[in-house]
């Protein structure tokens, strides 16, 4: 009624639909992505159960550990044959060494090696005791992404897709496991060299 007095002549249903869409858009904007200052945060995930074959037709099933610093977008990836907790710890230590530091917080998907009870809208996350102790020893705060909120881990999900796209052409092209590991290591270097070049060009 107030806006009618101010001269609005449109239908109420149109206005209601507009307000509804505006509210939805504002809600989406609130969870678009996680952005932080330098040294604050990183994201971790796995590219799970990739399958490739060497020149002789032998099958290799493996995982790619994914680590991305939020601000600089520096990345660390490495091939693993399993996703056990000890493997995760080793990958994290290697990532800290590669990036020359430990961020204040690291965002994780709700993987079993990290959480005993996932974070939900109504319940707080319960971290695995061994993992939580590791985080304290390494001096970072673990943060669990809420399920079905892909915006909070967009960097690692984009990286996972990119890694698969870059590795897939080598299917049936490499000789053995050693060369496969080297392919992933070379890609890790290439990812960061590419990122540095893009930043330099933008400046």
Role assignments for model-derived ranges:
Residues 1-8:
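DNA-recognition alpha helix
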Residues 17-33, 166-170, 188, 192-194:
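Short, basic alpha-helical nucleic acid-contact segments in DNA-binding proteins
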Residues 19-75, 83-90:
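Mobile-element integrase/transposase regions
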Residues 102-123:
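Acidic/histidine-rich, metal-coordinating catalytic segments
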Residues 108-109, 121-122, 142-164, 176, ...:
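RNase H-like two-metal-ion nuclease catalytic core shared by retroviral integrases
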Residues 160-203:
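Active-site-proximal acidic segments at structured loop/helix or strand boundaries
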């Amino acid at each position: 009624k107030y806006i009618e007095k101010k001269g609005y002549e449109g239908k109420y249903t149109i206005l209601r639909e507009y307000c509804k869409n505006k509210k939805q858009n504002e809600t989406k904007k609130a969870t678009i992505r996680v952005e932080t200052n330098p040294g604050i945060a990183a994201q971790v995930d796995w590219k799970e159960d990739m399958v490739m074959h060497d020149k002789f037709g032998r099958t290799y099933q493996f995982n790619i550990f994914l680590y991305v610093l939020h601000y600089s977008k520096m990345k660390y990836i490495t091939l693993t044959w399993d996703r056990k907790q000890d493997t995760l710890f080793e990958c994290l230590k290697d990532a800290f060494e590669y990036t020359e530091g430990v961020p204040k917080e690291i965002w994780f998907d709700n993987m079993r090696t990290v959480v005993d009870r996932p974070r939900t809208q109504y319940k707080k996350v319960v971290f695995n005791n061994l993992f939580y102790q590791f985080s304290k020893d390494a001096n970072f705060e673990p943060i669990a992404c809420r399920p079905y909120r892909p915006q909070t881990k967009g960097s690692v999900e984009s990286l996972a897709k990119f890694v698969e796209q870059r590795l897939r052409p080598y299917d049936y092209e490499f000789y053995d496991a050693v060369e496969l590991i080297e392919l992933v290591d070379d890609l890790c270097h290439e990812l960061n060299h590419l990122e540095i070049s893009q930043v330099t060009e933008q400046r």
